[in-house]
């Protein structure tokens, strides 16, 4: 994206480019960026794709845990054209238990334009 006409906008928004194939690893790059800034917002989708994912990628969780920052959860309700902020969650290190608590917050808050493409963990909720 930084080699496109969007570059000035991305720079103005203070978007940080990441090197997906760097030796340090994407998760560690993001943790390092969070730790060296006084204030930062990192946005990502745990599905890691725009298509039907069977599981969440764990990077969002490991980034929050490693940087010692909360996860702020949002849900999109396509039917009502609404975005909900579901609150924050501080990871404990027990991914499976924490994921169940996180998914419970999405209960009844999601309606997708293409429900068949919704990530499997969210289809139950």
Model-identified regions with their sequence ranges:
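Soluble catalytic domains of membrane acyltransferases
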Residues: 1-108, 118-125
């Amino acid at each position: 994206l930084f080699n496109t006409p969007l570059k000035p906008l991305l720079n103005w928004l203070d978007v940080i480019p990441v090197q997906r194939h760097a030796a340090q690893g994407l998760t560690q790059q993001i943790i390092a960026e969070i730790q060296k800034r006084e204030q930062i917002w990192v946005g990502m989708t745990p599905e890691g794709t725009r298509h039907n994912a069977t599981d969440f990628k764990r990077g969002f969780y490991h980034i929050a845990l490693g940087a010692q920052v909360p996860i702020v959860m949002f849900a999109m309700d396509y039917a009502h054209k609404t975005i909900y902020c579901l609150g924050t969650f501080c990871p404990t290190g027990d991914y499976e238990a924490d994921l169940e608590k996180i998914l419970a917050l999405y209960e009844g808050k999601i309606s997708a334009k293409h429900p068949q493409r919704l990530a499997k963990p969210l289809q139950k909720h």
